[in-house]
Amino acid sequence: MAATPTLDTATAVLAAVREDKSTADAAEVRMFQAAVDWAAMHSVDSIGPAAVWEGELPIAGEGAPLVAEFCVAEFALAIGKSTDAGRAYLGEAVEVRYRLPKLWAHVVAGRVPVWKARQIAKATLSLPMEGAGFVDTHVAPVAARLSYAQLERVVEEARVRFDPIEAEARRLAAADGRCFD
């Protein structure tokens, strides 16, 4: 481990923090890209005859590639997460890359942090492809400053437009939970 220089002024401390934050953000983007590369290497299409013995796993929404089951545990181990957390990370990376391409471009360019892209991906997983495209178009340009409430409104609008049956089912389920005694 390299020795850390002594930071003896406020300016030096802030400069070091900014540099470390920039380095950490760039590393997170590289890991997100690596997750997509890993999924592509282990997509059901790319593993050929081994797919007969290996189960297919949908880790992202409709239209995203299916991956071989074994690859999730290996990836999770490599990033130091549980299998479930690794699957979520892998799925959210694939969701952004394949179903939210405008957002992906902003993430790769460093304009949107990975944590925010993952939050958006998690919200779009259950949308049909057209709904994800709607969210991508409306959210990508402002994703870095988007609040969770704003994201929920855009996702709900996409659900109503592109999956009205599911939107109505969710509305009724929410209404069932309300009661006055």
PLM features per residue range, with description:
Residues 1-181:
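Conserved C-terminal region and hinge/linker of Rieske [2Fe-2S] proteins, especially
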